[in-house]
């Protein structure tokens, strides 16, 4: 009895896990095999019709490919900029604490509010960005109504909001590095670039991998900026899986089909991120990490 007593304290957490994760997941799986929508509230079994429709849904698969490209591009830019800013702050610039707080402001802004602000900046007719382009003699750009510029606008917003996260994690990692390797590099006469490439960057690899993985997980759910700024348009040029699932489930009221899309989205996200994590782990081994 005494040996099993500590396990009793796991029961509240286990019940909470069942209530908020396992039961909704099992219920969602059941819903995918039904015809549940706004006109049919019952869970009538229809076999794999929803899954077959999903396989033929080119719009859904296109949104997945778009998300894959968008998430990797934005996270890569965030990492490079975040690392550069972290190195800048790490070197002991004046008013480091002030700049540290200032750089965190975008991340602390509510995503929907941030997207509204950026939408006003990118607006073609009265937006501040086109006004600036006109002042310097350049032609205005249709940021939100053309495919290419719209994707660039979404990328800018995502980078602006989440680069501070990379900065925060990487700066914490830099501040935790031991000083001895840098002292040894200085004694050997290593240049600043050599010290970074041979000492700083390899020692930061585990922290970098962790930060990138966290951001990839979060970037796989891009929704606020897309839905607020472009509604997935023009056409479907900026539509992500989350935006498409939202439309099919809560605007078209096709609950069962939306659940099917969401479940496949979850499966693919888990598989992709697991593979990426294993690749990162394998790449880090030759460096002795």
Please name every model-derived segment.
Residues 2-289:
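A structural signal for multi-pass alpha-helical bundles of membrane permease subunits
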């Amino acid at each position: 009895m005494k040996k099993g007593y500590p396990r009793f304290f796991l029961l509240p957490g286990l019940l909470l896990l069942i209530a908020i994760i396992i039961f909704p997941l099992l219920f969602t799986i059941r819903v995918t095999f039904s015809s549940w929508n706004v006109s049919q509230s019952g869970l009538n079994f229809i076999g794999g019709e929803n899954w077959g429709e999903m396989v033929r849904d080119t719009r859904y698969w296109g949104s997945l490919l778009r998300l894959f490209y968008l998430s990797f591009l934005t996270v890569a830019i965030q990492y490079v900029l975040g690392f550069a800013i972290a190195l800048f702050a790490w070197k002991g610039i004046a008013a480091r604490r002030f700049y540290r707080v200032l750089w965190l402001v975008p991340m602390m802004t509510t995503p929907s509010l941030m997207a509204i602000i950026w939408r006003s900046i990118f607006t073609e007719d009265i937006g501040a960005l086109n006004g600036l382009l006109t002042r310097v003699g350049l032609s205005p750009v249709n940021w939100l109504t053309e495919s290419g510029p719209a994707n660039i606008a979404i990328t800018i917003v995502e980078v602006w909001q989440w680069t501070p996260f990379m900065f925060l994690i990487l700066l914490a990692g830099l501040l935790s590095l031991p000083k001895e390797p840098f002292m040894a590099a200085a004694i050997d006469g290593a240049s600043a670039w050599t010290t970074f490439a041979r000492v700083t960057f390899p020692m930061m690899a585990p922290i970098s991998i962790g930060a990138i993985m966290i951001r990839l997980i979060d970037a796989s759910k891009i929704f606020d900026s897309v839905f607020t700024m472009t509604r997935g348009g023009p056409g479907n040029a900026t539509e992500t899986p989350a935006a498409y699932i939202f439309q099919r489930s809560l605007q078209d009221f096709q609950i069962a089909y939306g659940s099917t899309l969401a479940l496949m989205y979850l499966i693919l996200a888990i598989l992709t991120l697991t593979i990426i994590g294993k690749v990162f782990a394998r790449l880090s081994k030759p460096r002795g990490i």
